[in-house]
Amino acid sequence: MSSPVAGPAAYIIPEVKLGPGNGCPNSMARVDSSCVDKYEASLVQIDETGKESPFSPYEAPNGHNVRAVSREGVVPQAHISMVEAKRACNASGKRLCRAPEWKTACKGPEATRYPYGDNRVPGACVDTNRTSPMATLHQGEHSAQTMNDPLANQQENTLAPTGSAAACTNGYGVHDMVGNVHEWTDDGSFRGGYYLDTSENGEGCEYRTTAHAPAYYDYSTGFRCCADPGSLGEDVDES
């Protein structure tokens, strides 16, 4: 049953309509004919012995042996390019989400403008009254150097742990598809906006940025992975 959540508006967390036995691992949601990560991706680094440890979400993973995981309650990876996002998804047997399946997952079973409905609700997602790290750290300067400052997303009231905005979900059970970090898709765009902007390039699930090359990254760019049902097994544990 759907559950109410206290906050600045009468949020209702949608009931997840699809569960175990749908061909997707527990960390992914079944969305039509795709499996979609429930949470924005974080990374684990793999050493020469095969041991895995968390990779810093505040640094670019360029050249590191990493793979993508979908976990609740962790800071999602930022500072990642489309090129590196693809590599991280592939290392986990997944792929970077295709633009149409990403958009379908964001809109939910009811095909709404935002994950939670057709009307914007301030504070439902991580996109309201957040702090600009460029203003805090660099007097508003936006350059390749300042926008990849590892301290950017460590400032208060910036990037939030995955799943912390309880209302930013839908009946598929995917979280944070609007706000928090931009999410790269395989057409070279990133979608959904980030914690400072979810409207400049489209509202909510329609948000789409196409201005950057696949090798581009900054403090706002993240991703999530997708897969075909049955390709990974349903007992994959990413906890």
Q: What is the predicted role of each segment?
A:
Residues 1-100, 107-110, 210-239:
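Extended beta-strand/loop cores of jelly-roll/beta-sandwich
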Residues 82-209, 219:
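Functional-site microenvironments in short loops/helix caps that host divalent-cation chemistry
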